[in-house]
Amino acid sequence: YAMVPACDGELGSVVRVYRDFKNLGDVEFLKTIWPKVVLAMEYALKQWDLDGDDVLDGQQNTTYDIEFYGPNPMTDSIFLAALKCCEEMAEIVGDEEHHQLYADAYEKGAARADQLMFDGEYYIQVQKEIDKYKYQFGKGCLSDQLLGQFLAYMAGIGEILPKEHVKSAMESVFKYNYKTDFYHTDSVHRAYAINEEHGMVVATWPKGGRPKFPLSYAGEVWTGVEYEVAVNLIYSGCVEEGLTVVKSIRDRYDGYKRNPFSEIESGHHYCRAMASWGVLNALLGLQSDMYRGTLSFHPAIEGEMSSFFICGKAWGIYSQKEENGKMCKHIDILYGTLDDIHVQE
């Protein structure tokens, strides 16, 4: 198997640069790494956008151990998130040339991607000859279709595609891919959910169009993807659906049937499950920007609640309690300080 640069991994790393910078607020760190970020984006634009329309359409190696061909929402959403992050990073480091380049590419690419891939319900892969390449998903509903949106939320840049389309896509993933039993689900590789268990499969074809050799992991249940979808659902206002997905994971890894501290994909303690941290941030509505000196909470849960939180300069407990008929917010710092940080309502 020829290992080529991973499209999702490289572009996801660009998004993480901005996420980590905002958590640290260290401009020197950003200035030091910025030239490498520019090189990574130059490679992406040259290697994966073959026709120059700011939508990826080349051979795109991914975490599914295969290459996607043609426009597809999974890698392209990460590309859009990377462009948006780079637009903001370029402004911070004073790189006006690249700031304008990335701003224009994002605006053009987002509009084109939405036009090409949104089918009125969710985002699909665009392929004229779906069976030309093995392991594609075509018109199928991929749970991972808006992985880039998940990364965008974690980086605090909001929606990268029309908000109503993002919500529709996530509702569709829950509608078509969430299973309340696995008696009739084909899983020709590994069975991570069985019998009466609940979970979300990687892909389905509710409107037909399943390729002759489809995405090989389509019938599997990956907790890392489930957490990602849960986060996107919560940010889209579908809190109940998001928590339903999370509960299904915890019910499967309950300490009786499976180890609750080792969520399995390709082996024990698989790192994709660390996407679970995003659920905490989504439920808190936490936005941390140490560069701009702001911290805000907009909880998705109404009513009284209490939760751990962490940002670049402190960690502690956020709570909201009803006092004299009014919901009041409280922040208890257990380590660090927020003295120079503006906590926004």
Q: Could you say what each language-model-derived stretch is?
A:
Residues 102-113, 246-249:
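Short amphipathic alpha-helical coiled-coil/interface segments
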Residues 1-2, 18-27, 62-67, 210-215, ...:
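Glycine- and acidic
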Residues 85-102, 166, 176, 180, ...:
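N-terminal leader/propeptide and maturation segments of large enzyme subunits in energy/redox metabolism
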Residues 27-32, 97-100, 104, 240-244:
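Short, solvent-exposed positions on alpha-helices
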Residues 53, 193-198, 215, 219-220, ...:
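Non-catalytic C-terminal accessory modules of carbohydrate-active enzymes
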Residues 1-4, 47-71, 111-222, 254-255:
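Extended glycan-interaction surfaces of carbohydrate-active proteins
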Residues 2-6, 26-34, 68-75, 95, ...:
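Alpha-helix N-cap/helix-initiation motif
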